[in-house]
Amino acid sequence: MTNYPITYRLIKKEKHTGARLGEIITPHGTFPTPMFMPVGTQATVKTQSPEELKEIGSGIILSNTYHLWLRPGDELIARAGGLHKFMNWDQAILTDSGGFQVYSLADSRNITEEGVTFKNHLNGSKMFLSPEKAISIQNNLGSDIMMSFDECPQFYQPYDYVKKSIERTSRWAERGLKAHRRPHDQGLFGIVQGAGFEDLRRQSAADLVSMDFPGYSIGGLAVGESHAEMNAVLDFTTPLLPENKPRYLMGVGAPDSLIDGVIRGVDMFDCVLPTRIARNGTCMTSEGRLVVKNAKFAEDFTPLDHHCDCYTCQHYTRAYLRHLLKADETFGMRLTSYHNLYFLVNLMKQVRQAILDDNLLEFRQDFLERYGYNSSSRNF
């Protein structure tokens, strides 16, 4: 049996759904699953300190290979002792491969079998990223969980294009495995692609499972498809992945999508959504989204969320938060970001309890009604 640096321990399956309660053991600690992972693109979760993230209960955070490669450089981070020491974070770190950022640069990239040529968004210079280079960067960063280099095709791309794309992604995954210098202390995940095509998702999953990665990611979702389309892809994709390994749905952070992903057997999620919207004054609460910058909150001396135990809600009012954000004070962004991250990490804590109690579907229904989602449009 292979000894992986990343292992998944199943604790309990929910009786009525595909949801599973577990934990993932990494070289930098163990975290419970299902788990939402805050995103620290530039080796920092915007406006939050490592101590605050630990208070929130984030046992793992995500950093971005593409951005750290460009600035300050992966070799500099390696000389600093790796990403954990560089950013003073002693818990788990996951790095993406740079594939999604390259996907985002659709107008300035060229994909070949060797890799991707694209323009550096900082200075316009020509850059080249290959499967081997993506692995080398992540080896230098020293993350606990790494991603294979993949192409993320648009969800509505033609079948023939997506077929060629997933076959190339499988070849890239194999090249990445061979290039991986630190398999003893960094777990490399394969990324299943295939847009909305069931047979292509099946082919992609079969290719990657045969390579025996320590864990698997589901990519190519949350890129413009509907909620129902995402759920349909998860319905036929998640069962293709090994039960004894972690399953990670990339780039998903809306509360309803988190719950519906868990129902389909997903263990890990990440998204910039909670911090990005927080900086503009949009806050997630138990009764739906609240835009605290709105004028109606100017003299509202109540907490953001009456049912929230986070530091922000225990100590500050909507009126004060509105004032800070209207005055462009960084402290306001810190407080709203803290709250939104706490909200999603705590939501996953509640989901884990619902799995333990075998009442996840009831929890889902109650949450959607309170949050303001139209349940009929959120069928699963």
Curated annotation (Swiss-Prot):
GO terms for biological process: queuosine biosynthetic process; tRNA wobble guanine modification; tRNA-guanine transglycosylation. It holds the Pfam family TGT. Substrate binds at D96, S97, G98, G99, F100, D150, Q193, G220. Residues 251-257, 275-279 are annotated as: RNA binding. Keywords: Glycosyltransferase, Metal-binding, Queuosine biosynthesis, Transferase, tRNA processing, Zinc. Catalyzes the base-exchange of a guanine (G) residue with the queuine precursor 7-aminomethyl-7-deazaguanine (PreQ1) at position 34 (anticodon wobble position) in tRNAs with GU(N) anticodons (tRNA-Asp, -Asn, -His and -Tyr). Catalysis occurs through a double-displacement mechanism. The nucleophile active site attacks the C1' of nucleotide 34 to detach the guanine base from the RNA, forming a covalent enzyme-RNA intermediate. The proton acceptor active site deprotonates the incoming PreQ1, allowing a nucleophilic attack on the C1' of the ribose to form the product. Homodimer. Within each dimer, one monomer is responsible for RNA recognition and catalysis, while the other monomer binds to the replacement base PreQ1. This is Queuine tRNA-ribosyltransferase. The gene is tgt.
